[in-house]
């Protein structure tokens, strides 16, 4: 299993947010006795970066404030689903730990950092734990399928951190083993 994420968001008011994450994992796949139902489990990790730049104004004065951080991630992803030649659907209660390192910021006040939970080393102090329940749907033929995924992101430990409440993705799945054995 290999996943990648890239986001580059710029808004009209001089706000820019970027993020990159790469993940790799290994997994186990087993058809259940009631074929076409399957059980899958993955474990893996990843690394990434996040940065933000924004122009803040106070009356007639303005300043550009920035922050950057690196992150490491570990995850476990059990999954139960239905698989056929043309359609797959799965439910997964994915769990992940994210540890931020190398945090740096400039031109933010202590109050602004505290508002984003970035003050006093809170971001890099300990790992954050997340539950990420997910629904995955795949449509295609045999070893090549289009995948759509939707999930929630729930902070279950490690303290307060700003994060999105949900996520979605669209991608292509290539089952190399099935392709090879055809």
Regions inferred by a protein language model and the residue ranges of each:
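Glycine- and aromatic-enriched membrane insertion/assembly motifs of diderm outer-membrane
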Residues: 1-52
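Outer-membrane beta-barrel transmembrane domain signature
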Residues: 45-169, 173-182
């Amino acid at each position: 299993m290999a996943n990648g994420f890239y986001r580059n968001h710029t808004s009209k008011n001089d706000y820019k947010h970027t993020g990159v994450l790469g993940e790799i994992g290994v997994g186990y796949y087993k058809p259940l006795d009631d074929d076409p139902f399957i059980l899958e489990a993955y474990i893996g990790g990843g690394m990434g970066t996040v940065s933000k730049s924004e122009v803040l104004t106070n009356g007639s004065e303005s300043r550009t404030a920035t922050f950057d951080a690196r992150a490491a991630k570990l995850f476990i992803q059990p999954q139960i689903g239905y698989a056929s030649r043309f359609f797959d659907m799965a439910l997964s209660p994915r769990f992940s730990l994210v540890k931020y390192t190398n945090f740096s910021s400039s031109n933010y006040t202590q109050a602004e950092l505290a508002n984003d939970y970035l003050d006093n080393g809170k971001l890099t102090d300990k790992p954050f734990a997340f539950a990420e329940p997910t629904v995955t749907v795949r449509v295609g033929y045999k070893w090549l399928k289009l995948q759509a995924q939707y999930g929630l992101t729930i902070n279950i430990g490690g303290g307060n951190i700003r994060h999105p409440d949900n996520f979605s993705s669209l991608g292509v799945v290539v089952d190399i083993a099935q392709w090879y054995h055809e």
